[in-house]
């Protein structure tokens, strides 16, 4: 059950990260504070996506809290690295994100996935 909550947390946090990235690239920069505030108060699509991203992070924290009650921290913390993989893949697949493929990034993803497999593979007890 802890693994399920952890996966929910990772998926929701990844979606929230993508939402915040979209909103940040479409809203006025915060250096133009009044324009930024006006865009938020207009509550257009960009502001709603920003709000969804923030609410997504809040929901992700709730799922993470449930994860930590059911799963060892050493395993739970490793799950967070999956978010990097999901966001990287989504940025290349989703239109308008302009995520780029590189062999270095692929190698990094392979390292992350290998590490997760090492952590989550069942261990066998050795007999002496």
UniProtKB/Swiss-Prot annotation:
SUPFAM superfamilies for the chain: Multidrug resistance efflux transporter EmrE (SSF103481)
Main location: membrane
Regions that span the bilayer: 3-23, 36-56, 77-97, 101-121
Gene3D superfamilies in UniProt: 1.10.3730.20
Keywords of the record: Cell inner membrane, Cell membrane, Lipid A biosynthesis, Lipid biosynthesis, Lipid metabolism, Lipopolysaccharide biosynthesis, Membrane, Transmembrane, Transmembrane helix, Transport
Cytoplasmic side: 1-2, 57-76, 122-128
Subcellular location: Cell inner membrane
Periplasmic side: 24-35, 98-100
GO BP terms, alphabetized: lipid A biosynthetic process; lipopolysaccharide biosynthetic process
Membrane topology category: Multi-pass membrane protein
The protein's annotated pathway: Bacterial outer membrane biogenesis; lipopolysaccharide biosynthesis
NCBIfam families xref list: PRK02971.1-2
Quaternary structure and partners: Heterodimer of ArnE and ArnF.
Family assignment from sequence similarity: Belongs to the ArnF family.
Function field: Translocates 4-amino-4-deoxy-L-arabinose-phosphoundecaprenol (alpha-L-Ara4N-phosphoundecaprenol) from the cytoplasmic to the periplasmic side of the inner membrane.
The name this protein goes by in its record: Probable 4-amino-4-deoxy-L-arabinose-phosphoundecaprenol flippase subunit ArnF
Species this chain originates from: Escherichia coli O17:K52:H18 (strain UMN026 / ExPEC)
């Amino acid at each position: 059950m802890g693994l399920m909550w952890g996966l929910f947390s990772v998926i929701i946090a990844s979606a929230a990260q993508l939402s915040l990235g979209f909103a940040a690239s479409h809203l006025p920069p915060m250096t133009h504070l009044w324009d930024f505030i006006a865009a938020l108060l207009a509550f257009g699509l960009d502001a709603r996506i920003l709000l969804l991203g923030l609410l997504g992070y809040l929901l992700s924290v709730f799922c993470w809290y449930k994860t930590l009650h059911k799963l060892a921290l050493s395993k739970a913390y490793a799950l967070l690295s999956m978010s990097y993989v999901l966001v990287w893949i989504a940025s290349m697949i989703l239109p308008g994100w302009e995520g780029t493929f590189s062999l270095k990034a692929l190698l990094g993803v392979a390292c992350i996935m290998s590490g997760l497999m090492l952590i989550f593979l069942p261990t066998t007890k050795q007999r002496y």
